[in-house]
């Protein structure tokens, strides 16, 4: 089976290139008028060969699209040879029938569960970050009631506030460790574990 399902296998393109070279070498010994007519015939032959090659190429591209090997719908800026050369044949991409392509399980996004999509990273606005940092400056740990208040004020979920504080405490711990406060960070990690058990 061929790699390209619609490939016709005709060698007319390569045969046309050979006849052009032989017609040019034969015309080199004749008069100027014969040479110009031979050149015109060679040019016409080259044009026919090009059109045949282009037509065959376009058919192969259509078959590849039909087989689902090429799909530019995910990238609208990708080069599409059908759009680039279809002006020669009076065709457009929209005139082709819509082809439904099969979606195999390995093509789907993999998550922990079948229908679960990967969670995106939460970005906080400057005002949200400022308020969270301000609260962290005064209180490294939040009570459930305070976490609810902050989440309502900043339009975040309680889970987002909780995770932000966990991450901020880890950052604070790393910063303290970098300054040489290893004893403080050990005490803080024990306190982190105790407070997490009480606040959850």
From Swiss-Prot:
Gene3D superfamilies named among the record's database cross-references: Homeodomain-like
Primary localization class, coarse: nucleus
SUPFAM superfamilies with a match to the protein in the record: Homeodomain-like (SSF46689)
Segments of skewed composition (Acidic residues): 184-194
Effect of disrupting the coding gene: Defective QL neuroblast daughter cell migration. Lin-39 and mab-5 double mutants have reduced sex myoblast specific expression of sem-2 in the developing mesoderm.
CDD domains noted in UniProt: homeodomain
Subcellular location per the Swiss-Prot or TrEMBL entry: Nucleus
Gene Ontology molecular-function annotations: DNA-binding transcription factor activity, RNA polymerase II-specific; RNA polymerase II cis-regulatory region sequence-specific DNA binding
Tissue distribution of the protein: Expressed asymmetrically in the QL neuroblast.
GO cellular component: nucleoplasm; nucleus; RNA polymerase II transcription regulator complex
A Pfam family hit: Homeodomain
DNA-binding region coordinates: 115-175
Motif Antp-type hexapeptide, residue range(s) on this chain: 103-108
Biological process according to GO: anterior/posterior pattern specification; negative regulation of transcription by RNA polymerase II; nematode male tail mating organ morphogenesis; neuroblast migration; positive regulation of epithelial cell proliferation; positive regulation of mesodermal cell fate specification; positive regulation of transcription by RNA polymerase II; regulation of cell fate specification
Alphabetized UniProt keyword annotations: Developmental protein, DNA-binding, Homeobox, Nucleus, Repressor, Transcription, Transcription regulation
Region listing for Disordered, in residue ranges: 164-200
Stated family: Belongs to the Antp homeobox family.
Function: Transcription factor that binds to the promoter region of the transcription factor lin-39 to repress its expression in Q neuroblasts and thereby direct left Q neuroblast (QL) daughter cell migration. During postembryonic development, required for posterior-specific pattern formation. Within the posterior body region, controls epidermal, neuronal, and mesodermal cell differentiation.
Classification via PANTHER family: HOMEOBOX PROTEIN ABDOMINAL-A, HOMEOBOX PROTEIN HOX
UniProt-recorded name of the protein: Homeobox protein mab-5
Originating organism: Caenorhabditis elegans
């Amino acid at each position: 089976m061929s790699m390209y399902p619609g490939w016709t296998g005709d060698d007319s393109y390569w045969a046309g290139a050979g006849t052009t070279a032989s017609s040019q070498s034969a015309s080199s010994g004749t008069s100027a008028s014969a040479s110009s007519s031979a050149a015109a015939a060679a040019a016409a032959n080259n044009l026919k060969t090009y059109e045949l090659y282009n037509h065959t190429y376009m058919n192969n591209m259509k078959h590849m699209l039909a087989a689902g090997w090429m799909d530019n719908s995910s990238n609208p800026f990708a080069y599409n040879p059908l759009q680039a050369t279809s002006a020669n044949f009076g065709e457009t991409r929209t005139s082709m029938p819509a082809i439904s392509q099969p979606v195999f399980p390995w093509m789907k996004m993999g998550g922990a569960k079948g229908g679960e999509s990967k969670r995106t990273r939460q970005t906080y606005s400057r005002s949200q970050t400022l308020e969270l940092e301000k609260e962290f400056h005064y209180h490294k740990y939040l009570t459930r009631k305070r976490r609810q208040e902050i989440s309502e004020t900043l339009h975040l979920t309680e889970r987002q506030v909780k995770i932000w504080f966990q991450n901020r405490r880890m950052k604070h711990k790393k910063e303290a460790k970098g300054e040489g406060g290893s004893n403080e960070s050990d005490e803080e990690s024990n306190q982190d574990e105790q407070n997490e058990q009480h606040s959850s």
